C-alpha cells in the first residue's frame, strides 16, 4: 500500500492494515485500530511529547490494573490486601507528580489527594458490597461520584484545553465500568468480568489529560524539526 497521495501528503490508516471483521480482536486492540483516521499530513512529535504521553498511559494503565488487583484481594479475602492497597495508593502520588513540573507543588499535591480519595472510596465501596451492606454501598457510591465531580472541576479549571463535559462523561464511564467489574467479580461471573476489564482498558483517561497538558505547555513539547 502506498501511503502517499499524488500531491505527496501522507494519508495512511492503521485500520487498513488489519483484516476484518474487527470483532475478532480484543476490545483494547479494537479501540486502537478503529479510532485511527486518515490524516492529510503528518505531524512531527518530539521525544518529550512521546515520553510524556507514554508515561501517562503507563500510570493510568497501572491505575486500572492495581484497582483490579485490590478488587480481587477484597472479594477473595487475600492476605496481600494491605500490600496491594499501599501500591495502589502510590498511583495517586505518581499522577500528582505528573503535574508537578507544569503546575507546581500545591496543584500537584491537591490532585494527588483527589486521586487518593477516589481510590480509597472505591476500595471501601467494594468492601461494603462484599459484606452486603447496602446502606454503606449507596453512601460510598454517592461520595465516589462527588469526588469524580471534584476531579473533573479541578482539571478543567487548571487547563483550558480540557472540556468539563467530555472529561465528566469519560470519568463517569470509568466509574460505571469499575463498578461493573466489582459486581461481576463478586458474582464470580468471571467471563463477564474479563469482558468488562477489556472495556476499562480502552477508556483510560491518559490521552485526554496528557494531550491537554501538551497543548497548554506546547513550548516545552514542540518538535525541534517543526517549521
Per-range role (PLM):
Residues 111, 116-119, 125-144:
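All-alpha RGS (Regulator of G-protein Signaling) helical domain and cognate RGS-like helical scaffolds
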Residues 42-45, 70-81, 96-107:
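Helix-loop segments that flank and shape redox-cofactor active sites
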Residues 1-39, 227:
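Acidic/polar low-complexity scaffolding segments in large eukaryotic proteins
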Residues 96-103, 107, 122-130, 152-155:
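Membrane-helix exit/interface motif
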Residues 87-109, 113-115:
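A glycine-rich, hydrophobic loop/mini-helix early in the fold
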Residues 67-70, 77-84, 107-117, 122:
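Early exported N-terminus immediately downstream of N-terminal targeting peptides
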Residues 8, 19-26, 49-55, 59-74, ...:
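C-terminal amphipathic alpha-helix
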